């Protein structure tokens, strides 16, 4: 165990604190219910990290974590969504309300779960249940201090106020976007969902299927994806029964076979690592440490990094109608970016359906992130080469009056 690994484990699961004990044991939590002791009592060296302290005998070294906004804080089975202003028409936005003098997070979540609603909103001594809708879309978070009123039944929890609600997502599935089928009539155009491998194509297909209600197809056939619910996987890519076609192809002939395309672009540093993990660990697996340290990784970067650039350049050059979507923008603002994608596909954008997708955006096709490398696998020479490819793609995008690559692509 190392401090980094423990912190990463807890942060990935959405906890506020990480604690280490006995030099090797990692604990996660949302609150600290013990008093401070002298730091000298934490005297055990981390078993996986010489020179660092990982608690002691019945003593925890505790770290407060800086969570990314997307990180999901959890209380039992419920996922913390944030602090939000009371909606204008409360009874329409959140149709079930119950007074709870002895309010706690668990009590409100249990009530809404029992009533089969995916949202539980705590408002002081009132609990409200409902769905994310245009009346209550959960898009404008407020400062959590505005919701910091303590629960009457649990002093370490916040229960919101009559004006500012603390919102949790229950385990109840929002079924408004779960129906999927093949197109009722053969499509008159072939639309590609094009990406470099590792850029999130499988995840994007999941989002598109939920948002449109139609299956996506593939230029290839992957039996494991078919078995996980991608029923369009078995159809020939020209069948016309699917809303769009997954492809990693980048040749002129292959590109010109499509009438339009959604071009999904991802930070090459992240895409290369994701594809390397897939190649050696499956769609939601991870490459072994030996693969990163062996000859496989340098050879992979040497072969795949140029392809990352030429893939985008070819689609921009030969594509008939190309909508560029950056993976990072899709993660950051799914509602807007997915709406753009659905519009290109010729399907009416239903806002309530997009809100439903937001609550189930990960599906079962995202790597958990719990096995991150503790070092940067990119050498200085690799970074120099990849940075040149990033600048090349950025210039090509701007040359077509499109937004360039996101700022976090560089510098590293």
Listing of model-derived features with the role each one plays in the protein:
Residues 1-176:
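Peripheral, non-catalytic regulatory segments
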Residues 5, 107, 202-203, 307, ...:
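Acidic, Ser/Thr-rich intrinsically disordered and amphipathic helical segments
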Residues 24-25, 107, 126, 133, ...:
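Non-catalytic cap/lid and distal C-terminal segments of serine-dependent acyl enzymes
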Residues 99-102, 123, 198, 202, ...:
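Intrinsic disorder
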Residues 173-325, 370-412:
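PAPS-dependent sulfotransferase catalytic domain
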Residues 212-213, 337-351:
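Non-catalytic, well-ordered alpha-helical segments in soluble enzyme domains
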Residues 217-218, 347-357:
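Short, surface-exposed acidic
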Residues 318-344:
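Phosphate-binding beta-loop-alpha motif at adenosine-nucleotide cofactor sites
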């Amino acid at each position: 165990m190392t401090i980094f690994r423990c912190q990463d484990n807890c942060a990935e699961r959405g906890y506020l604190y990480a604690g280490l004990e006995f030099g090797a044991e990692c604990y996660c939590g949302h609150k600290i219910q013990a008093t401070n002791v002298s730091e000298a009592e934490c005297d055990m060296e981390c078993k996986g990290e010489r020179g660092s302290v990982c608690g002691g005998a019945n003593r925890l070294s505790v770290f407060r974590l800086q969570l990314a906004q997307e990180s999901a804080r959890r209380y039992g089975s419920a996922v913390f969504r944030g602090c939000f202003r009371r909606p204008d028409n409360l009874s329409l936005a959140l149709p079930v309300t119950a007074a709870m003098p002895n309010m706690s997070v668990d009590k409100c979540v249990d009530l809404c779960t029992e009533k089969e609603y995916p949202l539980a909103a705590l408002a002081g001594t009132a609990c409200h249940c409902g769905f994310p809708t245009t009346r209550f879309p959960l898009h404008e978070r407020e400062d959590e201090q505005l919701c910091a009123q303590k629960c009457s039944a649990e002093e370490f929890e916040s229960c919101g106020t009559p004006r500012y609600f603390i919102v949790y997502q229950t385990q109840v599935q929002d079924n408004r976007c779960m129906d999927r089928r093949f197109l009722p009539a053969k499509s008159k155009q072939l639309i590609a969902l094009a990406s470099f491998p590792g850029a999130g194509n499988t995840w994007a297909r999941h989002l598109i299927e939920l948002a449109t209600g139609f299956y996506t197809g593939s230029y290839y056939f992957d039996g494991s994806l078919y078995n996980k619910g991608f029923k369009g996987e078995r159809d020939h890519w020209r069948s016309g029964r699917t809303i769009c076609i997954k492809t990693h192809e980048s040749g002129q002939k292959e590109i010109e076979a499509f009438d339009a395309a959604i071009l999904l672009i991802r930070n090459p540093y992240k895409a290369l690592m994701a594809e390397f993990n897939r190649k050696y660990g499956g769609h939601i697996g991870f490459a072994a440490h030996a693969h990163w340290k062996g000859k496989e990784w340098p050879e992979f970067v040497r072969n795949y990094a140029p392809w990352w650039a030429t893939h985008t350049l070819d689609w921009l050059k030969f594509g008939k109608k190309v909508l560029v979507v950056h993976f990072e923008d899709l993660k950051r603002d799914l509602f807007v970016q997915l709406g753009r994608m659905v519009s290109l596909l010729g399907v009416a954008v239903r806002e309530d359906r997009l809100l439903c997708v937001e609550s189930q955006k990960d599906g079962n096709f995202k790597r958990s992130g719990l096995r991150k490398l503790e070092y940067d696998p990119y050498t200085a020479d690799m970074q120099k080469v990849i940075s040149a490819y990033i600048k090349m793609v950025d210039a090509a995008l701007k040359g077509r009056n499109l937004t360039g690559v996101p700022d976090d692509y560089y510098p590293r």
